Amino acid sequence: MEGASERLEGMRQGNLRHRNMARVFGLIGSAGAAVSRADLAAASGLTKPTVSKLVDSLVQAGLVVEGEAVAGVMGRPKIPLQLEGYACFGVGLEIMWKRIRAVAMGLDGRVLARNEFALDVPSADYREVVRESAALVRGLRDSARRVCAAGGVDAPRDLGLCLAIPGRTDSDEETILSAPILDWFDVPFIRDLRDELGDEETFSAFNDNQLAVLFEVHEHPGESFLFVSASTGIGGAVVLDGHVYGGLNGWAGEIGHTVVDRHGPLCRCGRQGCIEAYLSRKALQERAGVASTTHIAETIGALFQDPDAQETAGELGELLGIALSNALNVLDINKVVLAGYLVDLLPHIAGPLAETLRGRALVNEVGEVALEASEAPGEASVLGACRMTLRPVFDNPAQWL
């Protein structure tokens, strides 16, 4: 009869195998190109026989595929390995002010399908928003399955749905506590959408800015940077060594409510002079003298065709530079990643922004501030939501064997 010590040892060995498998699977996923078993052994520090056994299990499960053997200069030919992108997929759904967007992503990060439709969410009938969102998700799942079937996988695993919300959600993951831009307060949208879809275990919801950060972390592995995004307001996050630092309440990096002028305009948060009071969608529309329904790209275009365009660029560039410099000085990091419509705004304010950063950011004493634009400025949140659905497979691929 097996004793307690034998059972404990078996559990330890099983846990070790699971950790090693996750390590190897993650290396295949992050390689950017096909890798061999020998490459994985060298990168992971595991023995070649151990790596081979782990890879064989992943191949048998359909999570990893082998390519044609490639002859090397020395030794046996190498068999390239890569993730089977059609093995499973997840869906990200983003609820925005005037639009609802959904994207389906395969295991290897490729977008399998995307769709969106225009809807004035704040003024729309609430039940209509629920029904239309559910219909969008169902249609996208069908499209993703067809793409996977065309790629040779007839029964891909559906990893579920992640919802991106421009606001705060309750810990019960059923209620949106506050999404001012949608005019939603204490709205049980998460619960109602889950019920409409019939999804239970495969449904999650997060703040849109948090999900956008997740996308950027994947694009900048292991790096430290300040993430700043604009969709309706100004949001941000702190990433240290590839990990999002949330702070005590999960609000770390909320640069939008950094005060840049204590005598400045009133912000929607009730405080004066926040950077959001200058750079929010509403603030830019009012400054450009356009209607509240005007698309942000048109708003920015109108703003800088104005006779006062140079003055506007100088003021907005300087104020954003002050906010960024303050944050960089506190965090002692040198990189900023901009997303959302800040990417569209950047060419117009780049000069005064750079000048302010040079004069105020302490990092310039030993280097310079690296200012980057997101590669997916308008879709970072929904793509991050897709990434969130894939996480369970990468965290523990052994569960999917």
Q: Each predicted region: which residue ranges?
A:
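Phosphate-binding/catalytic loop of phosphoryl-transfer enzymes
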Residues: L93, G151-V153, R157-A164, R168-Q285, ...
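ATP-binding/phosphotransfer module of carbohydrate and carboxylate kinases, centering on a glycine-rich
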Residues: M1-A69, V73-P77, Q82-R157, E219, ...
